[in-house]
From Swiss-Prot:
NCBIfam families reported in the protein's UniProt record: DNA_YbaB_EbfC (TIGR00103)
Pfam family of the protein (one): YbaB_DNA_bd
Protein name, as recorded: Nucleoid-associated protein EUBELI_02017
UniProt biased composition (Gly residues): 1-12
Region Disordered, annotated ranges: 1-42
MF terms in GO: DNA binding
GO-annotated cellular components: bacterial nucleoid; cytosol
Primary location: cytoplasm
Length: 116
């Protein structure tokens, strides 16, 4: 039989402390999520002729295109530059999200992965 306040099998521990820690982590994750949602992440492509900005909510908020990038005979190139800049901005957002999660979980390996 487990000792009072421990885990089955005699593993020591205090369930109340674990619950408090989990609640604290949840609160921190919610705070970090709110902070992340207010940030913007920008990336450029084509030497800066295309710039895309996304929010922490992973929504495109701005696209800037230098007029010199607009070639009616090569629309596909412009499309590729927009895609590249968008993907890079989203990658930066995800990188920041993972870094924030690692601060909270202390590197507990994927705990809550994908929450941000």
């Amino acid at each position: 039989m487990a000792k009072r306040g421990g885990f089955p099998g005699g593993m020591p521990g205090n369930m109340n402390n674990l619950m408090k820690q989990a609640q604290r982590m949840q609160r921190q994750m919610e705070e970090q999520q709110a902070e992340l949602e207010n940030k913007e992440f920008s990336a450029t492509a084509g030497g800066g002729v295309v710039e895309v900005t996304v929010t922490g909510k992973r929504e495109v908020s701005k696209v800037k295109i230098d007029p010199e990038a607009v070639d009616p005979d090569d629309v596909e190139m412009l499309e590729d530059l927009i895609v590249a800049a968008t993907n890079e901005a989203l990658r930066k957002c995800e990188e920041e999200s993972q870094a924030q999660m690692a601060k909270i979980t202390g590197g507990l390996g994927g705990l809550g992965g994908g929450l941000f």
